[in-house]
């Protein structure tokens, strides 16, 4: 009956029927198996798909600036830098833009991101800022842009290809 109601691969069936541990906790937004599956999935390697770069700038402390390069469903590169000033961070982003030639570079404009975005805009790079406090496109479903983007990423992970990267996995789950 549990399998009929919830499905053979559901956490309910894993616990109640098979006596296994659930794949995810009740409060966990992204299940570990989604990330593990994406890390095992081969790259699609669609060289005609546009490249998009995402940047989460940071300065000082334990946080790192992270630059992620995506082509279609594939994450093709993750670069991390710790402790750099704003202009050095801009330099790292320019290096990634020059190497990967993205259709767009999206930057978290909270905190340090405003200065990074302003400098890259001044230098005529095609960049767009995103503020995670913005209103979601579907405010009934999502409380803000951050929640909406996490939801979109969770859906995307079902077909994505991620590199084997323990820091990425820890950030996602």
Mark where each language-model region is.
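ATPase catalytic-site recognition across NTP-hydrolyzing enzymes
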Residues: 1-55, 69, 170-171
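Residues embedded in well-ordered secondary-structure elements
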Residues: 43-44, 56, 94, 142
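Short, flexible loop/turn motifs enriched in small residues
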Residues: 48, 59-66
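Generic detector of well-ordered alpha-helical packing
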Residues: 54-57, 109
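A general structural motif
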Residues: 57-60, 86-87
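Mg2+-dependent endonuclease catalytic cores in nucleic-acid-processing enzymes, primarily RNase H-like
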Residues: 73-173
